[in-house]
Swiss-Prot record:
Entry-linked NCBIfam families: DUF167 family protein (TIGR00251), PRK05090.1 (NF003466)
Family indicated by similarity: Belongs to the UPF0235 family.
Protein name in UniProt: UPF0235 protein VC_0458
Coiled-coil boundaries: none
SMART domains: DUF167
Pfam name, any one: DUF167
Length: 96
């Protein structure tokens, strides 16, 4: 299973989230998932909201275009980005 793939015009990502990091960043591969560090704590959905905002900024889409499909309450997530305007190089290199 790939960490990133296209499905029609959408981009799907399998992510491993590291909350409470010192800065937001795409760390690299973590097994078969893409590891993303975010500064938000994993409390009351703050990490998910922050992750959506961060990915939306990277892909130049609205926050509502980033959908957590699986893993709402865990570190392992599957995220769909609807019609991304831009795909960061770190992610583009992983697309199958």
């Amino acid at each position: 299973m790939a960490a990133a793939w296209r499905e029609g015009d959408d981009l799907l990502l399998r992510l491993y989230i590291q909350p409470k990091a010192s800065r937001d960043s795409i760390v690299g591969l973590h097994g078969e998932e893409l590891k993303v560090a975010i500064t938000a704590p994993p409390i009351d959905g703050k990490a998910n909201a922050h992750l959506s905002k961060y990915l939306a900024k990277l892909c130049k889409v609205a926050k509502g275009s980033v959908v957590v499909e699986k893993g709402e309450l865990g570190r392992h997530k599957q995220v769909r980005i609807l019609q991304p305007s831009q795909i960061p190089a770190e992610i583009a290199a992983l697309i199958e």
